[in-house]
Amino acid sequence: MTVLTDKVAVVTGAGSGIGEAIATLLHEEGAKVVLAGRNKEKLQNVANQLSQDSVKVVPTDVTNKEEVDELIKIAQQTFGGLDIVINSAGQMLSSKITDYQVDEWDSMIDVNIKGTLYTAQAALPTMLEQSSGHLINIASISGFEVTKSSTIYSATKAAVHTITQGLEKELAKTGVKVTSISPGMVDTAITAAYNPTDRKKLEPQDIAEAVLYALTQPKHVNVNEITVRPV
C-alpha cells in the first residue's frame, strides 16, 4: 500500500510544470487526483499518463470563484471526499513597476493571490467539518527576495506567504494542516521565458517531493513552511 492510498487530492495548475509533477507523484503514491487548470488539452495529456479510474480532469480558471467552488464540489462528488488541496496555479509576468504593465499586474494578482484565496475558501468548510485535510500553497523564494525586475511578482508571492501564515493560526487545533512551499528557480516553461539558461534551477519533481514530505508527516505534525533551493 502506498502512503496516500485513497486520499482525494485537488491540484490546480496541473497541466504542466510543478503542478503536473505534484499531481503525478500524488497519484503514484495512491491518491485519487483531480487535475485543475485552464487548458483542458494539457490536463487531458497528464491524465492519459495516469490510471483513468483515479483521475478526474476539471478545467478551471482559479480567478473565477464560481469555477473554483464547482471544482471542489466535483472532486467530492467524483471520489467521495476531500483530503488534500494543492494551490500550484501561478503566473509570472512583467513585474517592474516602471514598465507600467498594469494589465499584467492585475493578472498576477488575480491568479497568485485571489486564486489562492478562492481555493482555500472553497475547500476549508469541508476540511473543518471533518477535522482533517491539508492545504498546500506553492509560494516562491521571490516572496522573500525581491529583485529590480520582480517587484509585482514578489509582492504576490509574499502575499501567499502571509495568507498561509494567517491560515496556520486560524486553523490551529482544528485538525486541518496548512503548508507554504517556496521554491527557488524551477526549470519550467515560465522561467525559461524570463531567466538566463545558465542559472541553476530545480526540477518540478523536486517540488513534488517537498509536497509529499509535508503530506506524509505524523498526524500531530504540521510542516508550516518548506524552502527549496538549487545547489
Curated annotation (Swiss-Prot):
Which InterPro entries does the protein's record reference?
NAD(P)-bd_dom_sf (IPR036291), SDR_fam (IPR002347)
Keyword Oxidoreductase on this protein? yes
Q: Which Pfam families match?
A: adh_short
* Signal peptide segment: none
Query: Can you tell me which residues bind NADP(+)?
Result: 10-34
| Binding-site positions, substrate | 140
Q: Does the keyword Cytoplasm apply?
A: no
According to its UniProt record, which residues of this chain constitute the active site?
153
Enzyme Commission code(s) on record: 1.-.-.-
Please provide the record's keywords in A-Z order.
Oxidoreductase
UniProt xrefs under PANTHER family: DEHYDROGENASE/REDUCTASE SDR FAMILY MEMBER 11, DEHYDROGENASE_REDUCTASE SDR FAMILY MEMBER 11
Name of this chain's protein:
Uncharacterized oxidoreductase SAOUHSC_02778
What organism is this sequence from? Staphylococcus aureus (strain NCTC 8325 / PS 47)
